[in-house]
UniProtKB/Swiss-Prot annotation:
This is Subtilisin-like protease SBT3.5. The active site is at D142, H217, S552. It is found in: Secreted, Cell wall. The gene is SBT3.5. Expressed in roots, leaves, stems, flower buds, developing siliques and mature seeds.
Length: 774
C-alpha cells in the first residue's frame, strides 16, 4: 500500500493556476478550439485535426508526434505541442476560434440526506419515487476512484443503462473488472500533464497511472453524489450512521484528469486533460457532470475560451447534460465566486445541523464546549498554561498559535496550552498542535475567530477550537489562580437543535466579478464535515472513509439531487433543473430559523452567499413554474456580453447575428434578477413555463429590496392546456440618492400550493463605475 502525507488544503482549496516559465521558442501544449463539430463521425473530425496540424508542421509524422488530444465528441478541437509562432499561425486561421496555452490547476454522508429531507424511511419522497436515481449516470472529473470502496457496491443495482457508451480503461492497479453495475465507467487523461511535465517520473510517482484514486478526493465526491448503502459507518465513532449518496442507485462514471505531483505535495489538473475528459463524457452518455474544480480571481469572461470549464460545459449543456460545479473556497470575501457561466449550476457550501462539541472543564468547574474531532482518551485534570512573559525574565514567550515554537519547551511540556490566532488558514490549528507536541505538551486549546472553520486536528492529540470570547474566559481563569488546570473529554456528535445552519466561511461569495448581472452562486448545499468514502492511501482515511469540507463536497450533493430530479423529469432541460432548485430552495433552516453566513462578522445570509438558498429536493421535484432556457437564451447572453458574431457562430454551430442594439443582459431568463448599476428606471422581461397542474392561476407577491420600487405586470398569470408559457415584465426604480451597496428582496409567484421564488438583488449607482473604498 502506498503511503503519503497529503495536506488537507488540497480538498479545501479550489483551482490554483501553476505558473510555468518557459522559453518562448520552446514547444508547449496549446489547445486549438474550433467550436461546434461540423461532422457526426468522430473519426472524420479527428482526421481533419491531423490534416490541419500536418499542414502547419509539414508532415504527418510531425503532426502525430505533436498531437496530444483530438476533441471530437462534444465539440471540435485538439491539443498539440506547438511553439509560440506555430500557435500564432493557427490562431490566424479563419477555421480556428481560439488558441490558448495549456495551464495547470489544483483541486478546489451519514447525516446530509436526512437533513435535506431524503430519508429512506419515507416511502413517499423523491428518493423512493425515482427508485433512488436508477438509470441516471453521474460523471465526475476529479482525481479518480477507489473501486473497491464499499460505497461502490452494486447490491440491488439493476442492469447498466442502455444509453451508456463508455467503458472501463485498464491501467496501473486498475483493470476493467474493477467496474460493476454501480461504477460503470472509469477513464484517465494524463497526456496533457505529461506533455507539459516531461520530467515527471510515472514509475516513481506515488499516484497511480490509471483511474485509481491516490489522494481520495474523487472517491469522496463520487460517493457523496451516488454512493451505495453502507451500514454503520463513522469517523472514529463520530458522525455515525448508515452511509449513502444522494442517488444511491444512480450509476457513476469517473474521468481522472488530476494528478498528484510528489515534488509539489499537491494535485495538478491540465486544462487539455480536463477538456478531453469533458469531451469523452459527452460521448459516453452521462446525464449529470460534477466538477469540483475552478479557476482563480481574476476570471476570464464566460465568452473567453480560456475559461475551459465554461467552454466544455457549454457544449455539454447544449447536449442536455446538467453541469454542476463548486463555487470556490475563497470566502468570505465578496466577488470571489468561481464557475460563473450562466449554463453552469454553481454551488456554495453550508453547514449541517451537526457539530462535534468537545467538553473543556476548567479547575473552577466551568465547562466550555469547544469543537474538535478528538477521539482519544479523556485527559484528566492537567496543568494549563498561556505562554506570556510575567516580567521576571528576558526569555521570549508567545501565546500566538503560530509562534508557540518560540517558547521554551519547559513552558509547554506536560501541559495543555492555550493560544490565540487571527490566522484564517486551517494550518494555524495543525501547526499549533505540532509545536505543542514537539515540546512535550499534552494538548492545545485554540481561540480563533468564531466565523472561521479551521480544521480540527486529525489525530488523537487533544486539540480543541473555541472563539475569542470563550478563549478570554479561559485566559482570565489562568490568570486568577496559581495552579490552573483543565480536563478535556473526547468529542461527541450533536445533531439537530440547537445547532443552526450557516453558510461556511470558506465558501466563495458573490457578486459575480465577471458578469455582475448573473447571480452566482446559484444554490447552497451541505459541504462542511461531510463523511464519505476515500482512498485508503489518504493519511486521514479511517477504514476507507473520511470527513472533509469544501465546496468540493457541496457540488456533488447538488449533483446527487439533480440525478434524482433527472430520473423524475427525464425530458427537462438543464436550465429547468437549475430553476427548480433555485426557486424552491430553503431560506430558513429545518427549524424555521434564519440561515446565517459565517465571516467577520456573522450576518443573515443573502443571495450572494447561497443564491436561492439551500437545496430543497422534495420541493424541487414539483416547482410549479420554471424559468427555462435553451440555446437561444445562451446566445442572447453571449451577445449581451460582447462576443462577436463570428465567434458565437463557431461556438454554437449556427450562423448567429446579434441584434442591434444588443439585448440587455438583464433579460436573460434566469431564475433571479440582479441589477448591479441601477440609476434610471429599467424594465426587464421574464418567461415562466407551467410544469404543474394544467389549469393554474398564479398571483405575484413582491418583497422589494430596501429603497427599491418593483412593479410586475401582469400581476396574475393564467395557465391552461393551450397556454403553458407566459411572459411578464418587471419595472425597477430606486429612491436612493447616493451610491449604495446591494439590497435584497424576492419576487414570488404563488398558487397557494407553490411559492416560485426568485431572489432580487439591486445596487443603486448614481455615479457609475465608481469605487468607494470608505
Amino acid at each position: 500500500m502506498r503511503n503519503c502525507r497529503v495536506l488537507l488544503v488540497l480538498v479545501l482549496s479550489l483551482v490554483i493556476v501553476l505558473n510555468v516559465v518557459r522559453a518562448s521558442d520552446e514547444s508547449k501544449v496549446h489547445i486549438v478550439y474550433l467550436g461546434e463539430k461540423q461532422h457526426d463521425d468522430p473519426e472524420f473530425v479527428s482526421e481533419s485535426h491531423h490534416q490541419m496540424l500536418s499542414s502547419l508542421l509539414g508532415s504527418k509524422v510531425d503532426a502525430h508526434e505533436s498531437m496530444v488530444y483530438s476533441y471530437r465528441h462534444g465539440f471540435s478541437g485538439f491539443a498539440a505541442k506547438l511553439t509560440e509562432s506555430q500557435a500564432k499561425k493557427l490562431a490566424d486561421s479563419p477555421e480556428v476560434v481560439h488558441v490558448m496555452a495549456d495551464s495547470f490547476y489544483e483541486l478546489a454522508t451519514t447525516r446530509t440526506w436526512d437533513y435535506l429531507g431524503l430519508s429512506v424511511a419515507n416511502p413517499n419522497n423523491l428518493l423512493n419515487d425515482t427508485n433512488m436515481g436508477d438509470q441516471v449516470i453521474i460523471g465526475f472529473i476529479d482525481t479518480g476512484v477507489w473501486p473497491e470502496s464499499e460505497s461502490f457496491n452494486d447490491n440491488g443495482v439493476g442492469p447498466i443503462p442502455s444509453h451508456w457508451k463508455g467503458g472501463c480503461e485498464s491501467g496501473e492497479k486498475f483493470i476493467s473488472t474493477n467496474c460493476n453495475r454501480k461504477l460503470i465507467g472509469a477513464k484517465y487523461f494524463i497526456n496533457g500533464f505529461l506533455a507539459e511535465n516531461e520530467g515527471f517520473n510515472t514509475t516513481e510517482s506515488r499516484d497511480y497511472i490509471s483511474a485509481r484514486d491516490f489522494i481520495g478526493h474523487g472517491t469522496h465526491t463520487a460517493s457523496i453524489a451516488g454512493g451505495s448503502f453502507v451500514p454503520n459507518i463513522s469517523y472514529k465513532g463520530l458522525a455515525g450512521g448508515n452511509l449513502r449518496g444522494g442517488a444511491p442507485r444512480a450509476r457513476i462514471a469517473i474521468y481522472k484528469a488530476c494528478w498528484y505531483v510528489d515534488q509539489l505535495g499537491a494535485v495538478a489538473c491540465s486544462s487539455s486533460d480536463i477538456l478531453k475528459a469533458m469531451d469523452e463524457s459527452m460521448h459516453d452518455g452521462v446525464d449529470v457532470l460534477s466538477l469540483s474544480l475552478g479557476a482563480q480571481i481574476p476570471l476570464y469572461p464566460e465568452t473567453d475560451l480560456r475559461d475551459r470549464i465554461a467552454t466544455g460545459a457549454f457544449h455539454a449543456v447544449a447536449k442536455g447534460i446538467i453541469v454542476v460545479c463548486a463555487g470556490g473556497n475563497s470566502g468570505p470575501a465578496a466577488q470571489t465566486v468561481l464557475n460563473t457561466a450562466p449554463w453552469i449550476i454553481t454551488v456554495a457550501a453550508t453547514t449541517l445541523d451537526r457539530s462535534f462539541p468537545t467538553p473543556i472543564t476548567l479547575g473552577n468547574r466551568k465547562v466550555i464546549l469547544g469543537q474538535a474531532l478528538y477521539t482519544g482518551q479523556e485527559l484528566g485534570f492537567t496543568s494549563l498554561v498561556y505562554p506570556e512573559n510575567a516580567g521576571f525574565t528576558n526569555e521570549t514567550f508567545s501565546g500566538v498559535c503560530e509562534r508557540l515554537n518560540l517558547n521554551p519547551n519547559r513552558t509547554m511540556a506536560g501541559k495543555v496550552v492555550l493560544c490565540f490566532t487571527t490566522n484564517t488558514l486551517f494550518t494555524a490549528v495543525s501547526r499549533a498542535a505540532s509545536y505543542v507536541k514537539a515540546a512535550g505538551g499534552l494538548g492545545v486549546i485554540i481561540a480563533r475567530n468564531p466565523g472561521y472553520n479551521l480544521t480540527p486536528c486529525r489525530d488523537d492529540f487533544p486539540c480543541v477550537a473555541i472563539d475569542y470570547e470563550l478563549g478570554t474566559d479561559v485566559l482570565l481563569y489562568i490568570r486568577s489562580t496559581r495552579s490552573p488546570v483543565v480536563k478535556i473529554q473526547p468529542s461527541r456528535t450533536l445533531v439537530g437543535q440547537p445547532v443552526g445552519t450557516k453558510v461556511a466561511t470558506f465558501s466563495s461569495r458573490g457578486p459575480n466579478s465577471i458578469s455582475p448581472a448573473i447571480l452566482k452562486p446559484d444554490i447552497g448545499a451541505p459541504g462542511v464535515s461531510i463523511l464519505a468514502a476515500t482512498s485508503p492511501d489518504s493519511n486521514s482515511s479511517v477504514g476507507g472513509f473520511d470527513i472533509l469540507a469544501g465546496t468540493s463536497m457541496a457540488a456533488p450533493v447538488v449533483a446527487g439531487v439533480v440525478a434524482l430530479l433527472k430520473a423524475l423529469h427525464p425530458n427537462w432541460s438543464p436550465a429547468a433543473f437549475r430553476s427548480a432548485i433555485v426557486t424552491t430552495a430553503w431560506r430558513t433552516d429545518p427549524f424555521g430559523e434564519q440561515i446565517f453566513a459565517e465571516g467577520s462578522s456573522r450576518k443573515v445570509a443573502d443571495p450572494f452567499d447561497y443564491g436561492g438558498g439551500i437545496v430543497n429536493p422534495e420541493k424541487a421535484a414539483d416547482p410549479g413554474l420554471i424559468y427555462d432556457m435553451g440555446p437561444r437564451d445562451y446566445i442572447l447572453y453571449l451577445c449581451s456580453a460582447g462576443y462577436n458574431d463570428s465567434s458565437i457562430t463557431q461556438l454554437v454551430g449556427n450562423v448567429t447575428v446579434c441584434s442591434t442594439p444588443k439585448t440587455s443582459v438583464l433579460d436573460v431568463n434566469l431564475p433571479s434578477i440582479t441589477i448591479p448599476d441601477l440609476k434610471d428606471e429599467v424594465t426587464l422581461t421574464r418567461t415562466v413555463t407551467n410544469v404543474g397542474t394544467v389549469d393554474s392561476v398564479y398571483k405575484v407577491v413582491v418583497e422589494p429590496p430596501l429603497g427599491i420600487q418593483v412593479v410586475v405586470a401582469p400581476e396574475t398569470l393564467v395557465f391552461n392546456s393551450k397556454t403553458k408559457n407566459v411572459s411578464f415584465t418587471v419595472r425597477v426604480s430606486t429612491t436612493h440618492k447616493i451610491n449604495t451597496g446591494f439590497y435584497f428582496g424576492n419576487l414570488i409567484w404563488t398558487d397557494s400550493m407553490h411559492n416560485v421564488t426568485i431572489p432580487v438583488s439591486v445596487r443603486t449607482q448614481i455615479l457609475q463605475n465608481y469605487y468607494d473604498e470608505n
